[in-house]
Amino acid sequence: MDTKEEKKEQKERKQSYFARLKKKKQAKQNAEIVSAASSKSRSGKDDANSDILEQDKFNVTAEGDHSTDDKKKRKSNQLKEIRRTELKRYYSVDDNQNKTHDKKEKKMMVQKPQGTMEYTAGSQDTLNSVALKFNVTPNKLVELNKLFTHTIVPGQVLFVPDANISSSTIQLSSSTPGATVSPSSSDAEYDKLPDADLARKALKPIERVLSSTSEEDEPGVVKFLKMNCRYFTDGKGVVGGVMIVTPNNIMFDPHKSDPLVIENGCEEYGLICPMEEVVSIALYSDISHMKIKDALPSDLPRDLCPLYRPGEWEDLASEKDINPFSKFKSINKEKRQQNGERTLALDAKSVRSPEESTERTCTRIEPPDNSELWKLKNLQSSRGTTSESPSVTQLSMRAALEPTAKENCLLKGDEDFVDLEELSSQPESGINKGDATKECLSYDQKKDGPHTVMSAKKGHVQSAQEVMGPESDTELKGALDLETAEKQDEAPEVDKHSGSPENLGESTLNIHEDLDKIKLIEFYLNKNKEGSQLLENVQKSELSDRKSIEPGGIDITLSSSLPQAGDSPPEDNKEPGTLWVKGGETLPLKLDPSAEETVINNKEVLDSLGSSLDKMCHSAQMDNKSEIQLWLLKRIQVPIEDILPSKEEKSKTPPMFLCIKVGKPMRKSFASHTATMVQQYSKRRKQPEYWFAVPRERVDHLYTFFVQWSPDVYGKDAKEQGFVVVEKEELNMIDNFFSEPTTKSWEIITVEEAKRRKSTCSYYEEEEEEEEGLPILQPHSALLENMHIEQLARRLPARVQGYPWRLAYSTLEHGTSLKTLYRKSASLDSPVLLVIKDMDNQIFGAYATHPFKFSDHYYGTGETFLYTFSPNFKVFKWSGENSYFINGDISSLELGGGGGRFGLWLDADLYHGRSNSCSTFNNDILSKKEDFIVQDLEVWTFE
């Protein structure tokens, strides 16, 4: 009975234990249900606090019987459970209601970058495949999506560039301050709430705000540069191509369309060079250093072009040197903006204010009644002489001209060339691009006098007059040089043979025939977008009578003029064939009646010109910061094709010159390996130096790239390294100068003196022969002759040369037994030479790095070789295929093996032998036959 009662008590205890476990489980479930219900009804801090309080109450009532230590442990567990339930509101996946609630509260979303769209990754997608699909690089996708790894999972949403939006508009969200970044995972966000106290205070998910100085705002490091350049070859012309510069290599690929590439092939011009072989890199503004690359330092001229370094680089403060590249970019950008504003601002001496410009009136140029020609009369100024008053028409044109379209203009250069540039700009004030044209008359003082150049483009001609004095003329040219140097437009150079006017006060205007200019006029007048032809007849003419102009130095230029709305001509004076120009006075332009064989003979052209200018006078608004566009043409004596702007876009500014000095010649990227080696050996004597013409716009990029990736290379000279490169020929010349005996006069000597001198000079030669003599053999060999010994001694390894040879074993003395050979070689500790003579009197053998001995495996090193004198002396060294050098057995001795064949095999009696071709030495058969009979055998050691 007692046992039954004890069993019942134990059973009750067990039930109470499981009951307690069940109660704990129910308590946890109830706590979760309460927290979920409270999260639906409440939000924010109240939810967290209510959940915590309810759970605390429930747990206290359920666990009241336990000790204080258990309460402390349970309390810590409760805090952990609280933290988990709190975070379940944000990371719950199964509960749809919680998910919708989370979407409302969760603000940790990545801002969508501009110009991108969302793409959901599939099961087969990788970052590389997605990048290839949208034509971007994987690194760009990582940067756009703020990824921490290149691994993506199916269903992941990525931002990819939108094909409908240009790539230039794509901006990263990190570039704007305050952009939020998504967490990498839920675990990362979970770690941001370490305990329940922070969970109570968490009103919303934690988000990371990027500051404007964050590292992610900085653009990625430039890993390579790609630019168009021209390569100056060594006597094979100048070739255009693409240069790619990386931190490890410099490559140049020529354009396939280049004439030299078409003629000679791309193998001659493709280059590649590792950055480790580059000795020096330098940028110059001219090629003066190219001409003196082989000159001695003492012969260098003093006016060499200095090494290029940005001006702002030296002005950087110490705090900016921490990251000089980004600071330099910002400084350079500010300078470019200032230069752009300076080009828009005109000189106060040559441009009037808007208040002063209101005094200007419209002046018409009216053709005579009896002719359709323009006639030139004396120019009269309302203010007196034009030399004393400012050039009113010039000022009006400067203020009135607007960058309305691409206009072709010839600008005077510094010395003896004319630049033909194509100025591109945006239309303003509702002016049509087709209304931009030019006509100009300019001087040719040194040749035949002034010539007329007229050009029209895209349907309309705008004409104006400009009166300039000598001073204003020079100011205008300076302003033009400044403006055109700042532009990035085409400027092919054209030769001319005329100089600047020297005595403008006494000059006269004469119109002469010029066939090239007439062709130019006809080309531009016929170049209409609608296909209409403005000028139909362009005839050759020469004006014999020359009208003199009132003194004052006048340069008449017909240019486009856009007057203000208030300066429009009177309504009653709108006549066909009348051209209105801006000016301070009436300037009638007429030609001499004797010149009736004309330059322009079409009244319809004049009517269209007048009507178009009349409309523009009403519609156009004048801008006081407009640029001036003039034609300063002296004389064109080149074909018309040479002065027309080319289709490909070129930089107007002159290029910079990149000089790359390398340790050895660059490799030809398109040539074969053999041709490349021949080319390198052929040019080894020359100083390897390569020159490239690079655009000036990319010079700062090149400089920054080289300073960043190879700071020790840029600007380093050979003399800074402690040595001067001297060609081999110069060294030979110096050596020969001191080695050759000095020239002496003829002298007669006796025979005894001649013999004495001969014996004295040959003393050292005999000593050298003794030094290079045969090694000492102890005793004399019965098989080897001096010829054999000499040839063998030359092929022995260096560690045994010079030692006397000692005979260790000979069949004549010790008998024919392999065991005896092993016994005699046991005391040796040096390489041995095996010499065999067969019954055919053929001598052959082997050199072994170790003495012959009994062994269970092959031994020896790669210095082991086989040799034969049958019929000529040959040595077969180790091929490297295997290491079967020497193997000593009781029944045989083997040297070389592989494939069941031995290079040299001897039996136990040293009587029979065999020689085959083996893979160890790739040797021939050493004897005349594969099987041979040994006549004599010797083993020599070196001591």
Swiss-Prot record:
Annotated segments matching region Disordered: 1-83, 169-189, 334-369, 486-507, 543-576
Positions bearing Phosphoserine: S92, S182, S186, S211, S212, S214, S442, S498, S500
Gene3D superfamilies, per database record: LysM domain
Residues in TLDc domain copies: 782-943
One GO CC term, this protein: nucleus
Pfam families in UniProt: LysM (PF01476), TLD (PF07534)
Record field: compositional bias (Polar residues): 177-187
Residue positions, PTM Phosphothreonine: T137
Biased composition (Basic and acidic residues): 1-15, 349-369, 486-499
Coiled coil: 1-32
Matches recorded under InterPro entries: LysM_dom (IPR018392), LysM_dom_sf (IPR036779), TLDc_dom (IPR006571)
Residues where N-acetylmethionine is found: M1
Keyword tags: Acetylation, Activator, Coiled coil, Nucleus, Phosphoprotein, Transcription, Transcription regulation
Compartments reported by the entry: Nucleus
Molecular-function annotations in GO: nuclear receptor binding; transcription coactivator activity
Family: Belongs to the OXR1 family.
Subunit note: Interacts with ESR1, ESR2A, ESR2B, THRB, PPARG and RARA in a ligand-inducible manner. Interacts with the heterodimer AHR-ARNT.
Name of the molecule in the record: Nuclear receptor coactivator 7
Organism for this UniProt entry: Mus musculus
